[in-house]
A protein has these predicted regions:
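Beta1/beta-strand and adjacent pyrophosphate-binding region of the FAD-binding site
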Residues: 1-12, 28
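Short beta-strand/turn micro-motifs composed of small residues
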Residues: 8, 31, 96-97
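Gly/Ala-rich phosphate-binding loop of Rossmann-like dinucleotide-binding domains
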Residues: 17, 21, 164
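Glycine-rich FAD pyrophosphate-binding loop
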Residues: 21-41
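Short, flexible, mixed-charge acidic loops at enzyme active sites
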Residues: 39-45, 132-136
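Dinucleotide-binding Rossmann-like beta1-alpha1 core, especially the glycine-rich loop
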Residues: 45-129
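Flavin (FAD/FMN) cofactor-binding and adjacent substrate-gating region
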Residues: 70, 95-168, 173-174, 179-182
Length: 182
């Protein structure tokens, strides 16, 4: 009998299977389309970042960055000894007009408390860093260093996660859930 049955084998379902299997849980993932041609994750940019408003999301972003940087070690399997997600590190620039500036200043307090490495740039100083951006109407902007944020190939990341989850004992089956009961 399985400890956990996960409905859907996209990024979230597969990551859940990986982490639970790593803890020794018996996991089964039920996925209706194992080719993932109708899944949303292959179409996404695969961004990872720390610039959020809530502390929990900032900390999750920091965790994700550390995990992504360790993919070659953490997700290595016998079948895939050199996993990758084609990571590109390039900081995110978020810009705010006067109507959202105060909210962003409050968020920066959370960034500092979480040691997120976020830098505040006044709108009037934005062209010093990014001369190609028209800063009219920009009150403030935030930016992290180029090693803290970026993007990955989500399909490659999913494949590495799934391969490792399977090696750890997770079972992926094709199927569709029609109903749930106690």
């Amino acid at each position: 009998m399985d400890d956990v049955v996960i409905i859907g084998g996209g990024i979230i379902g597969t990551a859940t299977a990986y982490f639970l299997s790593k803890e020794g849980r018996k996991v089964k993932v039920i996925e209706r389309d194992p080719t993932y041609k109708t899944a949303s994750f292959p179409l996404s940019l695969g961004g990872f970042r720390r610039q959020f408003f809530q502390t929990e999301n900032i900390l999750l972003g920091k965790f994700a960055r550390e995990f992504i940087f360790q993919i070659p070690e953490l997700l290595k399997t016998e079948k895939n000894p050199k996993p990758t997600a084609s990571m590109v590190t390039n900081g995110y620039l978020l810009m705010f007009g006067p109507e959202h500036a105060e909210e962003q200043y409050k968020a920066l307090e959370n960034h500092k408390a979480c040691e997120a490495g976020t830098k505040n740039i006044k709108g009037s100083e934005l062209s010093n860093f990014f001369p190609y951006i028209n800063s009219d109407g920009i009150e403030t902007a935030t930016f992290t260093d180029n090693q803290s944020e970026g993007w990955i190939d989500p399909f490659m990341f999913h494949g590495a996660l799934k391969s490792k989850a399977i090696e750890l004992g997770a079972e992926f089956v094709k199927g569709e859930i029609k109903s749930l009961s106690e």
